[in-house]
């Protein structure tokens, strides 16, 4: 809070812009939300909440939002830059990943092993991601993970990872027919109208 008071002193003489993202912290110290909360309670502070379309285009953003939480209203949308394929085993996964790599896609790993922190800052035109049996949809239509015992949810990691794609996104769904069927339903929403 000492650093906050220094910044506030500066702000008396000139405009100061603060930015925070509690879901994408760089260091453990940033987990402390007291500074952000203190800023939010100050008089004459203007808050702006950014959308999820910071990096991705509208098509990818719409698909990712629908994937994270199934919409109650199915609005027509065409997703020409999204590919979803189903793999029955590891050999098929490898074949699909190699095929997408040949088309210029960069593979991203959804599970943490320390790699995500490095990947989180690297956007790419085309990304391919593996979704395995850990993912499922709950009764309210939210994508969930059976491996979310960590502080930072696997689904939240996946969300940030998917948003690294700038133009095209490919999903390889391994041995998870329920999630694959939902993905196909999202892709075909525009045909239902």
Indicate where each model-derived feature is located.
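Conserved helicase motor core of SF1/SF2 NTP-dependent helicases
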Residues: 1-101, 109-193
């Amino acid at each position: 809070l000492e650093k906050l008071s220094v910044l506030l002193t500066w702000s008396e003489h000139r405009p100061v812009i603060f930015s925070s993202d509690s879901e994408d912290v760089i260091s453990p110290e940033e987990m402390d939300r007291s500074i952000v909360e203190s800023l939010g309670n100050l008089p004459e502070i203007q808050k702006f909440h950014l959308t999820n379309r910071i990096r991705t285009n509208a098509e990818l953003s719409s698909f990712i939002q629908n994937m994270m939480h199934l919409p109650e209203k199915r609005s027509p949308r065409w997703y020409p830059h999204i590919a979803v394929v189903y793999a029955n085993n590891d050999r098929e996964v490898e074949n699909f990943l190699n095929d997408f790599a040949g088309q210029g896609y960069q593979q991203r790993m959804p599970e943490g092993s320390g790699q995500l922190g490095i990947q989180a800052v690297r956007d790419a035109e085309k990304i391919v991601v593996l979704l395995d049996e850990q993912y499922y949809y709950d009764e309210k239509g939210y994508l969930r993970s059976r491996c979310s015992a960590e502080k930072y949810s696997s689904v939240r990691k996946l969300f940030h990872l998917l948003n690294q794609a700038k133009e095209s996104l490919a999903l390889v769904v391994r041995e998870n027919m329920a999630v694959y069927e939902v993905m196909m339903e999202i892709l075909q929403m525009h045909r239902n109208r």
